[in-house]
């Protein structure tokens, strides 16, 4: 049996394991944060692929620079407020999905045994990457306004010194919360005072349909590193993500990426750039995504409140892809409900999958992004047959 220390530390992702189960056609999955298939812009991607192979076949099919395709890096820099900087792309590293960006960043800035602070509950992929790197985790409470920055401040005051503070500031995964404007200012001030890096993982920021987005953390302190991805706004199968960071951090990550995979696929980078940079495409596509996900979110929340309102509380999302539902029975354990739910033909992610120190037994993450209205209704009917009535 082959099992290194890194494998043991990382563990298996509950969500990735569930995806294999939910590929079965009889199961309605509320588990993975997969884009709705109807929203995937296949025609635009096909045009971009054909253009890349016709206009620049060598650039699309040959080895490329580790930093990434320069036109894509310039586009990302512009989206992150660096359009006026003639060397803005020097802050951008293109990665094989934002998951690789987090893994490289952790290796670049935190030695094994170093400390990383993050909300509890936390994104499963982040937990895997951080644990595989052998860092220690400081679990910080979170609520409807995101990471409790005052609790972090208390930990800092006692002498704890995280190298990184990881947040999903816009529509946190799994909780769906957005870090409030006041807490962003406070977190930025703490970073400047204590010298840690803020890692703002932002795959969902463009998927907002209610309210105004708070000021990005990167505009509040230069100790912010922003991670982004084409997965949620274009297509996850292209596996293109990025990090926007101070140049010295980007260079350190580039060195590590050279030893990992040399560079992200040149062809998919060109496809992503040509698609996203096509005049008028992104604005129209984001309208489609927001309209679709808002309708699906409202449909799922309405169905859950109608059929399971006596058994769970369900918040109303303002964006993103998830509902962080809570069972009203304080003795319940959502992990114990998963096998019966799958047997009944519906899947979700138990709260325990997101736990840093706590298990969140009464919580479950439900994604409304993938399924259509009829499938969401069916999923709720099946859940109603599994979750005990009061």
Would you name each region that the model predicts?
Residues 8-97, 104, 278, 347, ...:
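N-terminal small-domain helix-loop-helix segment of the aminotransferase-like
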Residues 343, 358-390:
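PLP-dependent enzyme catalytic core of the Aspartate aminotransferase-like
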Residues 59-194, 205-223, 293, 322:
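Conserved core of the PLP fold type I
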Residues 27, 203, 342-365:
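Conserved PLP cofactor-binding pocket of PLP-dependent enzymes
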Residues 253-258, 278-302, 330:
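Structural signature of PLP-dependent enzymes
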């Amino acid at each position: 049996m082959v099992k290194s220390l890194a494998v043991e530390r990382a563990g298996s992702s509950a969500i990735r394991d569930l995806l294999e189960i939910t590929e079965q056609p009889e199961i309605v999955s509320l588990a993975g944060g997969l884009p709705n298939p109807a929203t995937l812009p296949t025609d635009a991607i096909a045009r971009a692929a054909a253009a890349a192979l016709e206009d620049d076949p060598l650039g699309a099919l040959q080895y490329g620079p580790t930093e990434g395709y320069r036109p894509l890096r310039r586009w990302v820099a512009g989206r992150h407020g660096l359009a006026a900087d003639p060397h803005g792309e020097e802050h951008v590293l293109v990665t094989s999905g934002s998951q690789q960006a987090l893994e490289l960043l952790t290796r670049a800035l935190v030695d094994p045994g170093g400390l990383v602070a993050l909300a509890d509950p936390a994104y499963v992929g982040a937990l895997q990457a951080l644990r595989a790197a052998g860092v220690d985790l400081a679990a910080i409470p979170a609520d409807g306004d995101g990471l409790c920055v005052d609790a972090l401040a208390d930990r800092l005051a006692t002498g704890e010194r995280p190298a990184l503070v990881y947040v999903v500031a816009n529509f946190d995964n799994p909780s769906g919360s957005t870090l409030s404007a006041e807490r962003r200012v406070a977190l930025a001030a703490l970073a400047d005072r204590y010298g840690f890096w803020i890692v703002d993982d932002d795959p969902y920021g463009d998927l907002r349909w209610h309210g105004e987005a708070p000021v990005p953390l990167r505009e509040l302190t230069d100790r912010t590193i922003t991670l982004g991805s084409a997965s949620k706004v274009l297509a996850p199968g292209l596996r293109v993500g990025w990090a926007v960071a101070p140049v010295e951090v980007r260079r350190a990550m580039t060195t590590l990426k050279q030893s990992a995979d040399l560079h992200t696929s040149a062809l998919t980078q060109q496809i992503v750039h040509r698609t996203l940079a096509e005049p008028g495409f992104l604005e129209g596509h984001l309208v489609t995504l927001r309209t679709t996900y808002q309708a699906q979110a409202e449909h799922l929340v309405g169905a859950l409140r109608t059929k399971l309102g006596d058994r769970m509380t369900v918040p109303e999302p303002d964006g993103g892809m998830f509902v962080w539902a809570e069972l009203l029975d304080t003795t319940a354990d959502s992990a114990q409900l998963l096998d019966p739910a799958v047997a009944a033909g519906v899947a979700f992610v138990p709260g325990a999958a997101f736990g840093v120190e706590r298990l969140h037994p009464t919580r479950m993450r439900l994604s409304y992004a993938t399924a259509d209205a009829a499938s969401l209704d069916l999923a709720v009917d099946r859940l109603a047959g599994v979750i005990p009535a009061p």
